[in-house]
Protein backbone atom coordinates (compact mmCIF):
# COMPACT_ATOMS: atom_id res chain seq x y z
CA UNK A 1 0.00 0.00 0.00
CA UNK A 2 0.96 3.63 -0.45
CA UNK A 3 0.70 6.18 2.34
CA UNK A 4 0.83 9.88 1.50
CA UNK A 5 1.27 12.82 3.86
CA UNK A 6 -1.49 15.34 3.28
CA UNK A 7 -1.12 19.06 2.68
CA UNK A 8 -2.24 20.99 5.76
CA UNK A 9 -2.04 24.76 5.48
CA UNK A 10 -0.31 26.31 8.46
CA UNK A 11 0.61 22.92 9.90
CA UNK A 12 2.60 20.56 7.69
CA UNK A 13 5.36 22.84 6.45
CA UNK A 14 8.87 21.89 5.40
CA UNK A 15 10.22 21.56 8.96
CA UNK A 16 7.43 19.22 10.03
CA UNK A 17 7.84 17.27 6.79
CA UNK A 18 11.54 16.92 7.57
CA UNK A 19 10.84 15.55 11.04
CA UNK A 20 7.97 13.25 10.11
CA UNK A 21 9.58 11.73 7.04
CA UNK A 22 12.69 10.95 9.08
CA UNK A 23 10.73 8.61 11.38
CA UNK A 24 8.17 7.32 8.88
CA UNK A 25 7.81 5.54 5.56
CA UNK A 26 5.72 7.97 3.53
CA UNK A 27 5.61 7.44 -0.21
CA UNK A 28 4.94 11.09 -0.96
CA UNK A 29 4.35 14.45 0.71
CA UNK A 30 2.14 17.18 -0.74
CA UNK A 31 3.09 20.75 0.20
CA UNK A 32 0.93 23.44 1.69
CA UNK A 33 -0.74 25.22 -1.21
CA UNK A 34 0.91 27.82 -3.39
CA UNK A 35 -1.80 30.42 -3.96
CA UNK A 36 -2.09 31.28 -7.66
CA UNK A 37 -4.10 34.32 -8.74
CA UNK A 38 -3.16 36.21 -11.88
CA UNK A 39 0.57 36.01 -12.33
CA UNK A 40 3.55 33.72 -12.69
CA UNK A 41 4.92 33.58 -9.18
CA UNK A 42 8.60 34.26 -8.50
CA UNK A 43 10.94 31.40 -7.77
CA UNK A 44 11.36 32.49 -4.15
CA UNK A 45 7.68 31.75 -3.46
CA UNK A 46 8.10 28.14 -4.52
CA UNK A 47 11.33 27.81 -2.55
CA UNK A 48 9.70 29.27 0.55
CA UNK A 49 6.84 26.79 0.53
CA UNK A 50 8.86 23.89 -0.82
CA UNK A 51 12.56 24.29 0.01
CA UNK A 52 12.90 20.61 -0.90
CA UNK A 53 12.94 21.78 -4.53
CA UNK A 54 16.60 22.57 -3.90
CA UNK A 55 17.14 18.94 -2.89
CA UNK A 56 15.73 17.13 -5.94
CA UNK A 57 12.20 17.53 -4.54
CA UNK A 58 12.97 15.31 -1.57
CA UNK A 59 13.04 15.80 2.17
CA UNK A 60 16.46 15.38 3.85
CA UNK A 61 15.58 11.73 4.51
CA UNK A 62 14.68 11.14 0.86
CA UNK A 63 10.86 11.27 0.68
CA UNK A 64 9.46 12.76 -2.53
CA UNK A 65 7.59 16.06 -2.32
CA UNK A 66 4.99 17.44 -4.73
CA UNK A 67 3.99 21.10 -4.94
CA UNK A 68 0.29 21.86 -4.60
CA UNK A 69 -1.32 24.80 -6.39
CA UNK A 70 -4.52 26.55 -5.38
CA UNK A 71 -6.35 28.80 -7.82
CA UNK A 72 -9.14 29.03 -10.35
CA UNK A 73 -7.69 30.49 -13.55
CA UNK A 74 -6.39 27.80 -15.95
CA UNK A 75 -3.80 30.00 -17.64
CA UNK A 76 -2.06 30.89 -14.40
CA UNK A 77 -2.41 27.41 -12.95
CA UNK A 78 -0.69 26.12 -16.09
CA UNK A 79 2.15 28.63 -16.01
CA UNK A 80 2.83 28.07 -12.33
CA UNK A 81 2.59 24.29 -12.72
CA UNK A 82 5.23 24.50 -15.43
CA UNK A 83 7.43 26.59 -13.16
CA UNK A 84 7.02 24.17 -10.26
CA UNK A 85 8.24 21.21 -12.28
CA UNK A 86 11.00 23.26 -13.90
CA UNK A 87 12.22 23.95 -10.37
CA UNK A 88 12.22 20.21 -9.70
CA UNK A 89 8.82 19.35 -8.21
CA UNK A 90 7.87 15.72 -8.73
CA UNK A 91 4.66 16.62 -10.50
CA UNK A 92 1.99 19.03 -9.26
CA UNK A 93 -1.26 18.79 -7.33
CA UNK A 94 -4.42 20.90 -7.70
CA UNK A 95 -6.27 21.83 -4.51
CA UNK A 96 -10.03 21.48 -4.97
CA UNK A 97 -10.86 20.63 -1.39
CA UNK A 98 -9.67 23.30 1.04
CA UNK A 99 -12.71 24.35 3.13
CA UNK A 100 -11.21 27.61 4.44
CA UNK A 101 -13.64 30.52 4.23
CA UNK A 102 -10.83 32.84 3.16
CA UNK A 103 -9.75 30.50 0.37
CA UNK A 104 -13.32 29.79 -0.75
CA UNK A 105 -14.16 33.48 -0.70
CA UNK A 106 -11.51 34.10 -3.33
CA UNK A 107 -12.84 31.33 -5.58
CA UNK A 108 -10.28 28.65 -4.79
CA UNK A 109 -10.16 25.31 -3.02
CA UNK A 110 -13.50 23.63 -2.35
CA UNK A 111 -15.38 26.37 -4.22
CA UNK A 112 -14.40 24.59 -7.43
CA UNK A 113 -16.55 21.64 -6.35
CA UNK A 114 -19.63 23.69 -7.20
CA UNK A 115 -18.68 23.63 -10.88
CA UNK A 116 -16.83 20.50 -12.07
CA UNK A 117 -16.12 22.27 -15.37
CA UNK A 118 -13.75 24.59 -13.51
CA UNK A 119 -11.93 21.58 -12.09
CA UNK A 120 -11.69 20.10 -15.59
CA UNK A 121 -10.30 23.30 -17.10
CA UNK A 122 -7.77 23.83 -14.32
CA UNK A 123 -6.52 20.25 -14.23
CA UNK A 124 -6.40 20.04 -18.03
CA UNK A 125 -4.35 23.21 -18.28
CA UNK A 126 -1.92 21.91 -15.69
CA UNK A 127 -1.68 18.52 -17.40
CA UNK A 128 -0.86 20.15 -20.73
CA UNK A 129 1.79 22.35 -19.11
CA UNK A 130 3.59 19.53 -17.32
CA UNK A 131 5.76 16.93 -19.09
CA UNK A 132 3.90 13.67 -19.62
CA UNK A 133 6.26 11.62 -17.45
CA UNK A 134 5.45 13.72 -14.37
CA UNK A 135 2.22 13.20 -12.40
CA UNK A 136 -0.60 15.71 -12.10
CA UNK A 137 -2.88 14.91 -9.17
CA UNK A 138 -6.05 16.53 -7.89
CA UNK A 139 -7.41 16.59 -4.35
CA UNK A 140 -11.18 16.92 -3.92
CA UNK A 141 -14.02 16.40 -1.48
CA UNK A 142 -17.30 14.65 -2.28
CA UNK A 143 -18.96 17.96 -3.06
CA UNK A 144 -19.80 21.36 -1.64
CA UNK A 145 -22.94 20.73 0.42
CA UNK A 146 -23.88 17.26 -0.83
CA UNK A 147 -22.37 14.35 -2.73
CA UNK A 148 -24.69 14.72 -5.71
CA UNK A 149 -21.90 15.91 -7.99
CA UNK A 150 -19.25 13.47 -6.83
CA UNK A 151 -19.25 11.54 -10.10
CA UNK A 152 -19.18 14.73 -12.18
CA UNK A 153 -16.22 15.92 -10.13
CA UNK A 154 -14.40 12.60 -10.50
CA UNK A 155 -15.12 12.41 -14.23
CA UNK A 156 -13.82 15.95 -14.69
CA UNK A 157 -10.52 15.00 -13.08
CA UNK A 158 -10.07 11.88 -15.20
CA UNK A 159 -11.13 13.53 -18.44
CA UNK A 160 -8.67 16.34 -17.78
CA UNK A 161 -5.87 13.79 -17.96
CA UNK A 162 -4.91 13.77 -14.30
CA UNK A 163 -2.66 10.95 -13.13
CA UNK A 164 -4.45 10.25 -9.86
CA UNK A 165 -7.22 11.55 -7.62
CA UNK A 166 -7.27 12.03 -3.85
CA UNK A 167 -10.78 12.01 -2.38
CA UNK A 168 -11.56 13.33 1.08
CA UNK A 169 -14.68 11.42 2.10
CA UNK A 170 -16.78 14.40 3.20
CA UNK A 171 -18.32 17.48 1.63
CA UNK A 172 -17.05 20.97 2.26
CA UNK A 173 -20.00 21.73 4.53
CA UNK A 174 -19.31 18.60 6.59
CA UNK A 175 -15.86 19.91 7.42
CA UNK A 176 -13.98 17.39 9.54
CA UNK A 177 -16.87 15.91 11.51
CA UNK A 178 -16.11 12.23 12.04
CA UNK A 179 -19.71 11.03 11.80
CA UNK A 180 -19.94 12.18 8.18
CA UNK A 181 -16.99 10.26 6.76
CA UNK A 182 -18.11 8.23 3.74
CA UNK A 183 -15.49 5.74 2.61
CA UNK A 184 -18.11 3.93 0.52
CA UNK A 185 -18.54 7.03 -1.62
CA UNK A 186 -14.79 7.00 -2.22
CA UNK A 187 -15.15 3.36 -3.27
CA UNK A 188 -17.95 4.22 -5.67
CA UNK A 189 -15.68 6.79 -7.30
CA UNK A 190 -12.80 4.31 -7.44
CA UNK A 191 -14.95 1.76 -9.25
CA UNK A 192 -15.98 4.38 -11.79
CA UNK A 193 -12.52 5.64 -12.74
CA UNK A 194 -9.54 4.15 -14.53
CA UNK A 195 -6.98 6.23 -12.67
CA UNK A 196 -5.76 5.50 -9.11
CA UNK A 197 -7.95 6.87 -6.32
CA UNK A 198 -6.43 7.65 -2.93
CA UNK A 199 -8.67 7.65 0.16
CA UNK A 200 -8.46 10.45 2.72
CA UNK A 201 -10.27 11.13 5.97
CA UNK A 202 -10.56 9.62 9.49
CA UNK A 203 -7.48 7.43 9.25
CA UNK A 204 -6.00 7.42 12.73
CA UNK A 205 -4.44 3.97 13.19
CA UNK A 206 -3.96 0.51 11.67
CA UNK A 207 -7.56 -0.52 12.24
CA UNK A 208 -9.15 2.56 10.65
CA UNK A 209 -6.78 2.32 7.68
CA UNK A 210 -7.70 -1.33 7.14
CA UNK A 211 -11.39 -0.51 7.44
CA UNK A 212 -11.07 2.39 5.00
CA UNK A 213 -9.30 0.24 2.41
CA UNK A 214 -11.77 -2.62 2.84
CA UNK A 215 -14.77 -0.35 2.30
CA UNK A 216 -13.31 1.87 -0.42
CA UNK A 217 -11.24 -0.74 -2.22
CA UNK A 218 -8.37 1.74 -2.38
CA UNK A 219 -4.82 0.52 -1.85
CA UNK A 220 -3.48 3.99 -1.06
CA UNK A 221 -4.40 6.41 1.70
CA UNK A 222 -3.54 9.98 2.59
CA UNK A 223 -3.23 10.98 6.23
CA UNK A 224 -3.27 14.47 7.69
CA UNK A 225 -4.25 15.34 11.26
CA UNK A 226 -3.48 11.82 12.47
CA UNK A 227 0.14 12.27 11.42
CA UNK A 228 0.48 14.86 14.17
CA UNK A 229 -1.46 12.84 16.75
CA UNK A 230 0.85 9.85 16.24
CA UNK A 231 4.20 10.98 14.79
CA UNK A 232 5.01 7.56 13.28
CA UNK A 233 1.53 6.98 11.86
CA UNK A 234 2.64 5.85 8.41
CA UNK A 235 4.50 2.94 10.01
CA UNK A 236 1.49 2.17 12.20
CA UNK A 237 -0.75 2.16 9.13
CA UNK A 238 1.61 0.27 6.83
CA UNK A 239 3.14 -2.28 9.17
CA UNK A 240 0.87 -2.34 12.24
CA UNK A 241 3.76 -1.08 14.34
CA UNK A 242 3.00 0.33 17.81
CA UNK A 243 2.67 4.07 18.15
CA UNK A 244 5.82 6.00 18.96
CA UNK A 245 6.64 5.90 22.70
CA UNK A 246 6.36 9.20 24.54
CA UNK A 247 10.13 9.59 25.17
CA UNK A 248 10.71 9.38 21.40
CA UNK A 249 8.00 11.97 20.82
CA UNK A 250 9.75 14.31 23.25
CA UNK A 251 13.05 13.73 21.44
CA UNK A 252 11.30 14.69 18.20
CA UNK A 253 9.96 17.88 19.80
CA UNK A 254 13.41 18.70 21.10
CA UNK A 255 14.84 18.34 17.62
CA UNK A 256 12.05 20.54 16.30
CA UNK A 257 13.05 23.38 18.62
CA UNK A 258 16.59 23.21 17.23
CA UNK A 259 15.52 23.58 13.62
CA UNK A 260 15.51 27.09 12.26
CA UNK A 261 12.67 28.42 10.17
CA UNK A 262 13.83 30.58 7.26
CA UNK A 263 12.48 34.10 7.76
CA UNK A 264 11.28 33.28 11.29
CA UNK A 265 10.08 36.33 13.22
CA UNK A 266 10.62 34.62 16.55
CA UNK A 267 7.05 33.42 16.89
CA UNK A 268 7.27 30.33 14.70
CA UNK A 269 8.07 27.76 17.37
CA UNK A 270 5.72 29.39 19.86
CA UNK A 271 2.72 28.76 17.64
CA UNK A 272 3.82 25.46 16.16
CA UNK A 273 4.92 23.70 19.35
CA UNK A 274 1.65 24.61 21.05
CA UNK A 275 -0.26 23.52 17.96
CA UNK A 276 1.55 20.19 17.78
CA UNK A 277 1.06 19.52 21.48
CA UNK A 278 -2.67 20.13 21.09
CA UNK A 279 -2.72 17.32 18.52
CA UNK A 280 -0.52 15.04 20.64
CA UNK A 281 -2.88 15.44 23.61
CA UNK A 282 -5.42 13.33 21.73
CA UNK A 283 -3.10 10.31 21.91
CA UNK A 284 -0.66 10.93 24.75
CA UNK A 285 -1.76 11.83 28.27
CA UNK A 286 1.73 13.17 28.96
CA UNK A 287 1.27 15.79 26.26
CA UNK A 288 -1.48 17.47 28.28
CA UNK A 289 0.87 18.25 31.17
CA UNK A 290 3.54 19.55 28.82
CA UNK A 291 1.00 21.66 26.95
CA UNK A 292 -0.16 23.26 30.20
CA UNK A 293 3.44 24.11 30.99
CA UNK A 294 4.29 25.78 27.67
CA UNK A 295 0.94 27.37 26.85
CA UNK A 296 1.80 30.45 28.95
CA UNK A 297 5.17 30.92 27.25
CA UNK A 298 5.27 33.46 24.46
CA UNK A 299 8.73 33.40 22.92
CA UNK A 300 10.82 30.80 21.15
CA UNK A 301 13.78 30.73 23.59
CA UNK A 302 11.49 29.99 26.54
CA UNK A 303 9.62 27.32 24.59
CA UNK A 304 12.89 25.74 23.49
CA UNK A 305 14.32 25.76 27.01
CA UNK A 306 11.18 24.16 28.43
CA UNK A 307 11.26 21.37 25.86
CA UNK A 308 15.02 20.87 26.02
CA UNK A 309 14.93 20.70 29.83
CA UNK A 310 12.96 17.46 29.75
CA UNK A 311 15.18 14.54 30.75
CA UNK A 312 14.17 11.74 28.40
CA UNK A 313 16.00 9.18 30.52
CA UNK A 314 13.57 9.85 33.36
CA UNK A 315 10.39 9.50 31.30
Swiss-Prot record:
The record marks 35, 95, 176, 272, 274, 279, 295 as: Interacts with tRNA. One of its GO terms (biological process) is tRNA dihydrouridine synthesis. FMN binds at residues 7-9, 68, 139, 200-202, 224-225. The active site is at 98 (proton donor). Changing residue 98 to A: Loss of enzymatic activity. Its cofactor is FMN. Disruption phenotype: A dusA dusB dusC triple mutant exhibits a complete lack of 5,6-dihydrouridine modification in cellular tRNA, whereas each single mutant exhibits a partial reduction, compared to wild type. It comes from the Bacteria. This is tRNA-dihydrouridine(16) synthase. The lineage of its organism: Bacteria, Pseudomonadati, Pseudomonadota, Gammaproteobacteria, Enterobacterales.
